[in-house]
């Protein structure tokens, strides 16, 4: 409700309080004074590293283990979206022979498909994993702006909402984590239902 209210206020007003009145938004970013560039992926990775004591995710160890484990193959379909630029770095550039990237080139038409992490669009990932001999298979398809994802082990598919519910359950019941649950607009109310339990 707060986000919607603020967005409506900003849209209808002449001035947005978070943007200086003298800032010319028609200028290229490189010409804007005092602009501080941010590496969003590196910042996120540092937040995860710094928060290990809170959430228990040993990010660097996970990446090292992934790179060293010859039994694992990962296949990610970015559907020509912006996330295509970050997947390898997100996973700390694992061996290329065990990281399959599908539809990872720029294509503003998204190859003529609806660029969503649907079961139909997951099929190339499933086929790519079926051709692999590694016993542990992780597949994912990510929508173009990277906020929706679907997973597979090559056989079973797990939607974003199912994964979220499983993760919440694991964090609360197995890891004993307590606190608020955050979710996106695209998420279902499955997390809400679990939180009420």
Residue ranges of each PLM-predicted region?
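Gly/Ser/Thr-enriched, mixed-charge loops and adjacent short helices
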Residues: 1-133
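Proline/glycine-rich low-complexity loops and linkers
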Residues: 2-44, 154-197
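Acidic, glycine-rich loop-and-beta core segments that form the ion-binding/anion-interacting portion
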Residues: 100, 111-194
């Amino acid at each position: 409700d707060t986000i919607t209210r603020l967005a409506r206020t900003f849209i209808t007003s002449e001035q947005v309080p978070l943007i200086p009145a003298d800032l010319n938004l028609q200028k290229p970013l490189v010409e804007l004074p005092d602009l501080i560039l941010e590496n969003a992926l590196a910042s996120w990775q540092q937040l995860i590293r710094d928060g290990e004591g809170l959430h228990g995710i040993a990010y660097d160890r996970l990446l090292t283990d992934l790179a060293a484990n010859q039994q694992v193959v990962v296949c990610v379909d970015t559907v020509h979206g912006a996330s295509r630029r970050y997947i390898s770095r997100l996973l700390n550039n694992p061996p290329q022979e065990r990281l399959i990237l599908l539809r990872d080139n720029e294509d503003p038409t998204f190859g003529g498909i609806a660029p969503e992490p649907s079961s139909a669009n997951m099929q190339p990932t499933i086929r790519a994993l079926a051709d692999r001999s590694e016993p542990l298979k992780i597949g994912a398809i990510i929508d173009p702006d990277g906020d929706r994802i679907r997973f597979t082990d090559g056989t079973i598919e797990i939607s974003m909402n199912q994964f979220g519910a499983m993760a919440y359950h694991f964090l609360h019941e197995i890891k004993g984590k307590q606190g608020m649950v955050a979710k996106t607009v695209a998420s279902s109310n499955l997390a809400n239902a679990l939180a009420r339990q």
